[in-house]
């Protein structure tokens, strides 16, 4: 009966249900996992501001996370800013610090079309890893959420169009973010810069900014775009 009622619903409403289910379910699972940490007394936390520059890449997500970069023919790029705050120090009881973020990217389309802008919102899992044979460490981050753009980037639209006539991307898509950051305060020469100041630490690092349809959940077929670049993040 439920299947019959769903079949009678209008196309736009079915699409809305389809697009909404995945991010809502994933967010509920993540937030459910961090609720335990907050109930156990984790309060307050740090805020952080990231500014980054990223260029469109033809590289698949599988290899893009290790820095494999193949420039898109359009050579378009984005400049983004992201604000985040600590959410929890654990995820499902595991020592994985979680943060929530909102971001604003601006896209330079290199005269292929008008420039665009967008918004991202996501939850991010973080892990601090010591560099082998040293006493230094790097911070790894993996974020999952939603991305909305005022105008679909040309490199993304081309990725969909090559899959068939009339195939297009969507303004609302799934969002993934992968970061590798090097905190600067751990270096003795730079540590005095952060004493008695408003900025507790600052990092320089690599970022992958990824939009995709999640194998056709957000659009007619699978597809997406990667932007790869570098940025700075200040922790308050």
Predicted regions: what they are:
Residues 82-106:
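A glycine-rich, hydrophobic loop/mini-helix early in the fold
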Residues 36-86, 218, 233:
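Short glycine/proline- and aromatic-enriched beta-strand/turn motifs that initiate or cap beta-hairpins
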Residues 85-89, 100, 113-218, 234-236:
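Outer-membrane beta-barrel transmembrane domain signature
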Residues 220-236:
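Long hydrophobic alpha-helical segments typical of transmembrane helices together
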Residues 49-55, 62-70, 97-110, 204-212:
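Transmembrane beta-strand segments that form the barrel wall of outer-membrane beta-barrel proteins
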Residues 66-74, 110-114, 166-167, 217-221:
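Outer-membrane beta-barrel domain signature
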Residues 1-43:
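Cleavable N-terminal export/targeting peptides
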Residues 45, 73-79, 115-121, 171-178, ...:
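Residues that define the transmembrane beta-barrel architecture of outer-membrane proteins
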